[in-house]
């Protein structure tokens, strides 16, 4: 996120002018913009005008509007953020109080005003503008006849391509048909790889599968790259990593992120620290269950007893339209940090955030055992 101008008071009012440069930035903006804030941006609106002879005509006019936010919608596939609210900026074409939907797109500046820049909003802003936080990976997740290409960013995991090819059985007289279908499948995956994997953006490309499919495709990829002189692949072949997974389906992305050779490539990033924290939580839950808890009630009680060493929480919980609920979670994060603990805020649109959401979206590693939590209803 490019921050053009900031003018606010911590825990007080103010505004920030910013430009979203990628889909991760739009996700950060989605988490920053809350109901009751105001957003100013250039937009287009169809307006009616009189024409000679008494008729009316309509045209799209470029306007600068500021709306008081009533609803925010994030369209991941279209890379656009839609903000609906009432106009609060005097304009000859749009009355004050009229409803309008602003569409925030990549590379288009906007100004966000808040009455209260709390610690969560400031943390989100800091992460959004930190280039070192990037963890872009390209992942080719495959099994025979199925391949999917994902881009895993700081906060958003997006699907870029899905390739399906019917492959006959390998045995008997069908063997020739098998080999030709497999070659065609690999060729389709190669085309998608060339189109969607940009080594100037991603740290590495992971090819993952059960069995030997990944090795066969990797061999095909490098041979064809040499034959066709595909320079981006030839020059970055050391950044193509192979990982074993149990399937070629999306849920196996978690296995990819936990693989040691992948962790090593992204070890200094926010995403890697979150994956490690989630790993540590699962390990603790299976080895010392009294030192791990999840669910709002259990985590709240653990915090009251100053027992939380590491808090894991999804950003979904901070987007609650009820100000009291948001404040409760903001205070929880601050309380854990004040008592010397760590707090990791997971994106609900990231693989690790999806896994945490299955555990209610909130969990904690404890400094000392709290066996009595078992008796408290979640």
UniProtKB/Swiss-Prot annotation:
<keyword id="KW-0479">Metal-binding</keyword>
<protein>
    <recommendedName>
        <fullName>Protein PELOTA 1</fullName>
    </recommendedName>
</protein>
<dbReference type="GO" id="GO:0046872">
    <property type="term" value="F:metal ion binding"/>
</dbReference>
<keyword id="KW-0539">Nucleus</keyword>
<dbReference type="GO" id="GO:0070966">
    <property type="term" value="P:nuclear-transcribed mRNA catabolic process, no-go decay"/>
</dbReference>
<dbReference type="InterPro" id="IPR038069">
    <property type="entry name" value="Pelota/DOM34_N"/>
</dbReference>
<dbReference type="Pfam" id="PF03464">
    <property type="entry name" value="eRF1_2"/>
</dbReference>
<dbReference type="InterPro" id="IPR005142">
    <property type="entry name" value="eRF1_3"/>
</dbReference>
<dbReference type="GO" id="GO:0005737">
    <property type="term" value="C:cytoplasm"/>
</dbReference>
<dbReference type="InterPro" id="IPR005141">
    <property type="entry name" value="eRF1_2"/>
</dbReference>
<dbReference type="Pfam" id="PF03465">
    <property type="entry name" value="eRF1_3"/>
</dbReference>
<comment type="similarity">
    <text>Belongs to the eukaryotic release factor 1 family. Pelota subfamily.</text>
</comment>
<dbReference type="GO" id="GO:0070481">
    <property type="term" value="P:nuclear-transcribed mRNA catabolic process, non-stop decay"/>
</dbReference>
<dbReference type="Pfam" id="PF03463">
    <property type="entry name" value="eRF1_1"/>
</dbReference>
<keyword id="KW-0963">Cytoplasm</keyword>
<dbReference type="GO" id="GO:0005634">
    <property type="term" value="C:nucleus"/>
</dbReference>
<dbReference type="GO" id="GO:0071025">
    <property type="term" value="P:RNA surveillance"/>
</dbReference>
<dbReference type="InterPro" id="IPR029064">
    <property type="entry name" value="Ribosomal_eL30-like_sf"/>
</dbReference>
<dbReference type="InterPro" id="IPR005140">
    <property type="entry name" value="eRF1_1_Pelota"/>
</dbReference>
<dbReference type="InterPro" id="IPR042226">
    <property type="entry name" value="eFR1_2_sf"/>
</dbReference>
<comment type="function">
    <text>Component of the Pelota-HBS1L complex, a complex that recognizes stalled ribosomes and triggers the No-Go Decay (NGD) pathway. In the Pelota-HBS1L complex, pelo recognizes ribosomes stalled at the 3' end of an mRNA and engages stalled ribosomes by destabilizing mRNA in the mRNA channel. Following ribosome-binding, the Pelota-HBS1L complex promotes the disassembly of stalled ribosomes, followed by degradation of damaged mRNAs as part of the NGD pathway.</text>
</comment>
<dbReference type="InterPro" id="IPR004405">
    <property type="entry name" value="Transl-rel_pelota"/>
</dbReference>
């Amino acid at each position: 996120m490019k921050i053009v101008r900031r003018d606010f008071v911590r825990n007080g009012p103010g505004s920030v002018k910013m430009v979203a440069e990628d889909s991760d930035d739009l996700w950060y903006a989605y988490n920053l913009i809350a109901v009751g804030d105001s957003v100013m941006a250039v937009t287009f609106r169809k307006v009616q005008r009189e024409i000679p002879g008494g008729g009316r005509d309509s045209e799209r006019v470029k306007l600068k509007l500021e709306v008081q936010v009533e609803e925010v919608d994030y369209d991941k596939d279209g890379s656009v953020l839609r903000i609906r609210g009432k106009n609060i900026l005097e304009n000859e074409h749009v009355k004050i109080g009229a409803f309008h939907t602003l569409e925030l797109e990549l590379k288009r500046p906007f100004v966000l005003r808040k009455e209260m820049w709390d610690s969560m909003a400031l943390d989100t802003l800091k992460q959004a503008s930190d280039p070192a936080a990037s963890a872009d990976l390209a992942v080719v997740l495959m099994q025979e006849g199925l391949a999917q290409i994902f881009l895993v960013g700081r906060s958003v995991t997006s699907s870029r391509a899905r390739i399906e090819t019917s492959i006959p059985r390998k045995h008997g007289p069908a063997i020739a048909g098998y080999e030709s279908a497999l070659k065609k499948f690999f060729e389709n995956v190669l085309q998608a790889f060339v189109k969607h994997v940009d080594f100037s953006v991603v740290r590495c490309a992971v090819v993952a599968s059960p069995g030997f499919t990944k090795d066969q495709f990797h061999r095909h990829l490098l041979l064809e790259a040499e034959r066709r002189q595909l320079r981006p692949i030839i020059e970055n072949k050391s950044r193509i990593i192979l990982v074993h997974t149990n399937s070629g389906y999306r849920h196996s992305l978690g296995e990819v992120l936990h693989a040691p050779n992948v962790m090593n490539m992204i070890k200094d990033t926010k995403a890697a620290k979150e994956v490690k924290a989630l790993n540590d939580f699962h390990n603790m839950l299976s080895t010392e269950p009294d030192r791990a808890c999840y669910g709002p009630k259990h985590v709240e009680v653990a915090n009251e007893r100053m027992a939380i060493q590491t808090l894991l929480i999804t950003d979904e919980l901070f987007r609650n339209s009820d100000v009291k609920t948001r404040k409760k979670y903001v205070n929880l994060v601050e309380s854990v940090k004040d008592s010397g603990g760590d707090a990791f805020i997971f994106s609900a649109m990231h693989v690790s955030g999806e896994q945490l959401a299955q555990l209610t979206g909130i969990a904690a590693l404890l400094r000392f055992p709290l066996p009595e939590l078992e008796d408290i209803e979640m």
